[in-house]
Amino acid sequence: TGQRFSTGLKVMLRVSASMHPVYGFSLVVSDVNPEYTMGDLLRRRREILMRLKQEGILELNRMLPFPEVPQRIAVISARGAAGYGDFINQLYNNPSRLRFRTRLYPAVMQGVSAPSSIIAALERVMADAAMWDCVVIIRGGGATSDLSGFDTYELAANCAQFPIPIITGIGHERDDTVLDCVSHTRVKTCLLYTSPSPRD
């Protein structure tokens, strides 16, 4: 799965036992079942979505009014990320010659610190709330496990209740995260650059 071993991660392993006269008993891992781990990740994702639904906040951001063409855009992404650079290039060189104003609120977009870093970026956006029509959260493609930071309850609940519409451009077409499910509009990164307004 590409997922690093960490506390709470469930795995199914094939092991062989051995006894060494000096080092004692040991287990040697010969195989890992990735389907077992991915199944557990999907289960946790469903549990988070169910909790958000029970709390009545799952669709709050999706219900916010949205301008026909948002031109004042707060962007949350990693500084120097290729996805961010592509988005800005396409946005400012759009064929309709629309004018946009953007500002990057940098955040860590991968790993265990990603959720808290994105929440901190959202708090900075909130301090400038009157300036923005929407927030775009960009994270390009990668291994499915690299997107696990977008499947946490804390980040999802924060985004679901955020008072400005959030557009997510996370991963590839096949990738769906909890953050995608609570955002106003989800647009995969391959389409984000040509879609400044939500699609049905």
Q: What residue ranges belong to the model's regions?
A:
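Short, surface-exposed secondary-structure edge patches
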Residues: 2-5
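OB-fold/S1-family single-stranded nucleic acid-binding modules
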Residues: 18-43
